[in-house]
Amino acid sequence: MDGEEVAALIIDNGSGMCKAGFAGDDAPRAVFPSLVGRPRHQGIMVGMGQKDSYVGDEAQSKRGILTLRYPIEHGIVSNWDDMEKIWHHTFYNELRVAPEEHPVLLTEAPMNPKSNREKMTQIMFETFNVPAFYVSIQAVLSLYSSGRTTGIVLDSGDGVTHVVPIYAGFSLPHGILRIDLAGRDLTNHLSKILSERGYSFTTSAEREIVRDIKERLCYVALDFEQEMQTSSQSSAIEKSYELPDGQVITIGNERFRAPEALFRPADLGLEAAGIDQTTFNSIMKCDMDVRKELYGNIVMSGGTTMFPGIAERMQKEITALAPSSMKVKIIAPPERKYSVWIGGSILASLSTFQQMWISKQEYDESGPSIVHHKCF
């Protein structure tokens, strides 16, 4: 392994965004939407060089004429043809590398089905001909990037939220909990409450505008009831937002009502427990001896943990649930949007990791199932 030319590639395929780059870098080189768009209408502009599909930002910018699909739902790949297009785009258009020259580290959701891990492995070796491959659980990588090997990770992205307890670098499967409530649901919820104000966002393209409103203006209230009361008496929290067509809309208590669903999934009609209760439940599923270390190392990761106020609220709620003498610490690193990717970059750069890769030779001898023996 000499220098830059054989740097490993780290690809973190999220439900909403794909983060890709080179091991050893401190941030991903490419971050683009995990979406594939296909034209809604037959091409009428002859000679326009219309493609039959577009990926990422290009799909996003042409969204008015395309049908957009996200091949990763709730963190799990559900459409392999589209997924292959995203990987192809990552290698050739975003990173501009030949995949057959670089080891590739992919990330996966906790509890990813076995057949999915095998399929990922197979596509990497057979379609892209990579020389070496590894797959890592996203939450474990987030913990590494925070400089810990023990802790409990609340990883909330666009498609799924997981709570994953980790001890000495190994995830504790009996304590892993998943909530099918994440950024995309909050965006939909915000659309719904904005429509009560008379603003309508219906198409997949308009949904992206709502996502932008959410990312710029939403926050988590420390005390929801109190905040509702305050906002009804004053307009201090009102903000205006200019739509692409120049229309300006005003958004008030929607700013904190949308993300409140993370703590009260019932707002979305879901029976799940909130992120606070789920984190507590996960800790309680773990051995008594490790709980103290978990309470003291609650690490937030993923774009949906980026709301201002979320760490303080979490601290308050978990402290109320935990035994009274327990020291509760929430770690919310500023780079947590990319902490899964950063953890992958760190892991693949370790000298001790180099013998962990699945080589092409091993794959040719054992087939896709080797992933279960070498990646855990």
From Swiss-Prot:
Protein's cellular compartments: Cytoplasm, Cytoskeleton
Source organism (scientific name): Candida albicans
Physiological role: Actins are highly conserved proteins that are involved in various types of cell motility and are ubiquitously expressed in all eukaryotic cells.
Name of the top EC class for this enzyme: hydrolase
Reactions this protein catalyses: ATP + H2O = ADP + phosphate + H(+)
Assigned EC number: 3.6.4.-
Cell membrane in keyword set: no
Protein's gene: ACT1
One example GO MF annotation: hydrolase activity
SMART domains assigned to the protein according to its UniProt record, in alphabetical order: ACTIN
Protein name: Actin
